[in-house]
């Protein structure tokens, strides 16, 4: 979770979600409930996203490779998180495409 110029309203809500997840993890962990905070920092390659790009004059197939995330890759990350052993739970996971510029 990163704050950035021009994104104060967005960032404050995202930081609030992170705090909520931290509190829930501490509260529910003793009951063997794994709470994790995930950040999906990219567009997801769905027909909805592709249509919005076309409306903006962008042809999705012309985007650089790995710009949009494959929904199956996101699902696998969630699945792997779900199957973690309690002695090695992940609390926070950032999922982003290789092509993202830092």
Regions found by a protein language model. Give the residues of each.
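Catalytic loop of short-chain dehydrogenase/reductase
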Residues: 1-16, 22, 26-29, 44
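Short, flexible catalytic-loop segment of classical short-chain dehydrogenase/reductase
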Residues: 1, 38-51
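Short, hinge-like loop/turn segments at secondary-structure boundaries
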Residues: 52-56
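C-terminal helical subdomain
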Residues: 30-42, 57-102
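Residue-level preference for alpha-helix termini and adjacent loops
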Residues: 6-9, 14, 47, 67-68, ...
């Amino acid at each position: 979770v990163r704050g950035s110029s021009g994104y104060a309203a967005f960032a404050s809500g995202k930081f609030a979600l992170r705090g909520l997840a931290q509190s829930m993890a501490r509260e529910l962990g003793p009951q063997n409930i794994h709470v994790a905070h995930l950040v999906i920092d990219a567009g997801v390659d769905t027909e909805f996203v592709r249509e919005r790009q076309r409306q903006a004059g962008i042809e999705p197939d012309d985007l650089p490779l790995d710009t949009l995330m494959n929904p199956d890759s996101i699902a696998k990350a969630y699945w792997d998180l779900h199957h973690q052993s309690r002695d090695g739970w992940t609390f926070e996971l950032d999922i982003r495409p290789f092509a993202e510029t830092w």
